[in-house]
Amino acid sequence: MISKLTDTVTLNNGVKMPRMGLGVWQVNEGREVEASVTAALRAGYRSIDTAAAYGNETGVGRAIKQSGIPRSELFITTKLWNAHHGYDAALRAHEASLNKLGLDFVDLYLIHWPVKGKYLETWRAFETLYKEGRIRAIGVSNFHIHHLRDVLDSFPTVPAVNQIELHPLMAQKELRAFCAQHGIQVEAWSPLMQGHLDLPALAGIANKHGKSPAQVVLRWDLQSGIVTIPKSVHERRIIENADVFDFELDASDMAAINALDRGRRFGPDPDNFNF
């Protein structure tokens, strides 16, 4: 049983990644993101997921530094934005993110979106950074199967992680199976469906276990082998989201949640975005 917040999965290169972390999408730079990260670290989180596009890497880095937690105990993820695809641009973007975070390295660096015709050259830069030991693991975000095939057919380094929109209404079963087949860890962004949790099936399971629908969804992630990074700016909610290690969903619970899949996206389709 997955029993504590510091439990990890082992990525395809041997690096250990916490099964749960804090996401900071749409968390404002400055006091808000610093307070959010500080609350999470105080609550026992050791994984923080940011991105260049979020505009809050500086605040994340400041909160990490002020926490006093040894760097070796933390797992920090950031992502390369779409404007910085290409070999040289990606190298510069990586350096810029490190400078903002105030870190010597990140644990996981992701290509945020698969910009058509550009992501392969970017992956070449990622491989360079990885081989030089400047990143502990490299991965992608929002990659469909055909995007992953492009990378797998072109390069020796298999992405360690694919971070995708994934939740009970968008379970991504085919993509998850492909990732499992190739040793790519799936990570869920927007695991709580941007607040669309008012579903009778979730309410029933939550009542059964004395938990909230959000906690049920996060437990479903964990028991499905999915790394999850719920976002919140409220300390009470950050603590509540982490309170999912004292119960277990049974087979009927898991089946009921799996049956909610409708292929419903709340975010952009990686094959059809214009940013």
Q: What is the role of each PLM region?
A:
Residues 28-41, 86-101, 148-149, 170-171:
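Short, acidic/polar
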Residues 29, 114-267, 271-275:
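Beta/alpha (TIM)-barrel catalytic core signal, keyed to glycine-rich beta->alpha loops juxtaposed to Asp/Glu
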Residues 12, 61-73, 95-104, 128-130, ...:
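Acidic (Asp/Glu)-rich catalytic clusters
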Residues 1-74, 273:
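N-terminal binding-site loop/beta-alpha segment at the start of enzyme catalytic domains
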Residues 45, 103-106, 135, 159:
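A structural motif
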Residues 22, 48-50, 106, 138, ...:
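Alpha-helix N-cap/helix-start motif at helix boundaries, enriched for small hydrophobics
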Residues 2-9, 58, 62-65, 94-96, ...:
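Alpha-helical scaffolding within the catalytic cores
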Residues 79, 83-123:
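Glycine/small-residue-rich loop that forms an oxyanion/phosphate-binding "nest" at active or ligand-binding sites
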